[in-house]
Curated annotation (Swiss-Prot):
Source superkingdom: Viruses
Taxon lineage: Viruses, Varidnaviria, Bamfordvirae, Nucleocytoviricota, Megaviricetes
Protein name per its UniProtKB record: Putative DNA-directed RNA polymerase subunit 1 inactive homolog
Species per Swiss-Prot/TrEMBL record: Acanthamoeba polyphaga mimivirus (APMV)
Length: 108
């Protein structure tokens, strides 16, 4: 009887094979992540440009200060606009489902 530190599960004779499979799968996943990150130089300078840039207040970003140009929208108009976002173009087009092909037992 023992305790696997990686997976935090109790190991005895009954579930040692299960825990071994889990720990091997965990190690494989960790190895894939490390190998994907190895040898790649990440561009840190481009990320630092965003951090070093000065913030502009929202008030300075507005083009037109004239409040009369902003029209209040009615409740009906907002509902109609919301409904139009879900037009038939955005619906998923499901593929045609064909019947399963019957293969012989030698073609598996």
């Amino acid at each position: 009887m023992g305790f696997n530190k990686e997976d935090r599960i109790l190991i005895n004779n009954n579930n040692s094979r299960i825990s071994r499979g889990i720990s091997e799968r965990y190690k494989g996943k960790e190895g894939r992540i490390r190998s994907n990150m190895m040898g790649k130089r990440h561009d840190v300078k481009s990320l630092l440009e965003y951090l070093d840039s000065t913030c502009i207040p929202i008030e300075n970003m507005l083009c037109n200060d004239d409040e009369s140009s902003i029209k209040p929208q009615s409740k009906y108009h907002r509902q109609k606009k919301f409904r139009n976002n879900f037009s038939s173009q955005n619906k998923f087009h499901h593929q045609k489902i064909f019947p399963r092909q019957k293969f012989s037992k030698f073609h598996r």
